[in-house]
UniProtKB/Swiss-Prot annotation:
The gene is thra. It is found in: Nucleus. Its main location: nucleus. A zinc finger (NR C4-type) spans 61-81, 99-123. Keywords: DNA-binding, Metal-binding, Nucleus, Receptor, Transcription, Transcription regulation, Zinc, Zinc-finger. Highest level of expression in erythrocytes. Also expressed in liver, tail, eye, muscle and skin. It comes from Aquarana catesbeiana (American bullfrog). This is Thyroid hormone receptor alpha. Residues 171-415 form the NR LBD domain.
Amino acid sequence: MDQNLSGLDCLSEPDEKRWPDGKRKRKNSQCMGKSGMSGDSSVSLLSAGYIPSYLTKDEPCVVCSDKATGYHYRCITCEGCKGFFRRTIQKNLHPSYSCKYDGCCIIDKITRNQCQLCRFKKCIAVGMAMDLVLDDSKRVAKRKLIEENRERRRKEEMIKTLQQRPEPSSEEWELIRIVTEAHRSTNAQGSHWKQRRKFLPEDIGQNPMASMPDSDKVDLEAFSEFTKIITPAITRVVDFAKKLPMFSELPCEDQIILLKGCCMEIMSLRAAVRYDPDSETLTLSGEMAVKREQLKNGGLGVVSDAIFDLGRSLSAFNLDDTEVALLQAVLLMSSDRTGLICTDKIEKCQETYLLAFEHYINHRKHNIPHFWPKLLMKVTDLRMIGACHASRFLHMKVECPTELFPPLFLEVFEDQEV
């Protein structure tokens, strides 16, 4: 490959020679960068009145004295002479050029198209470099190299930006430690859930009537199985919240409102991060593995689809315990729940968690582009799941006998706004 290709985004090299006929040296090293104008893109720039910074106003072409547009093949020339010189070399036309007047033509803006030989000779005389005109293969190779260099610089800038993003302070690390421990101590089966889960028998929750598109019946056998694990699942969410220092400082009334508002969201998150693509199941409360239709027919309806879809999308995020814990803390401290007293204090608490969360994400350095905003979108998804479940709960109350509802289940979800 031509050594002139290496590492350049421009189309020519600097030249320190003086111009013939008393022309001065190029003004500065900016000429290298600006010579990228030699491509077709220069036409659109010129039509917009673009003038390179190294040219003086109305600076003439050193070949024909027309208005120069830039530094082309080591000389300041107009677009016409640049194109003429390039075509001549690329198509090897100069051996066929001839002159009717013994090679003595004066080349200017008016006469430049009348004698190709004298125009080409003047191009050479003023210093235009034949070796800088690339053939097709070299031009393709150069364009490829330019793109590779741009991509390399883009990645370097991205890495530099990531390295400059703040990581958790010592106070934030302590908060992160407390939140993570609160999650681990209240998350059933921990990292061993796959080994300890039990699959709900396939004949449960597969009621043909409940599965019919036009039917919204609840499979009572499946619903009964789910209610067996709902009380300990809710209790673990309450225990998680109580372990967070900022939560315990809130009035009791606000604590209750926050817990009722986030309970389904946190339980859904804990189930979603235990989505198993191989068996296409979610593991509820760390122990019961269920399929989509079983959860749907067991009372959740379309909410089941939302939780399974969330689980499938979250599997690409590869969240660790700390990220799941901080997501739960953000969901818990939602200041827009109806009836709260200390909304400002709760909002500041959530901001504290969010900032520590963002800094922790910076520390983790995930490979997914825009990881942080994409993860925050999952908070919105979980809030939607909570809202849909509040509506779905009313349907369950109609379809299912009251005696099947555990007291804590009723206490948490019965008075929620729809």
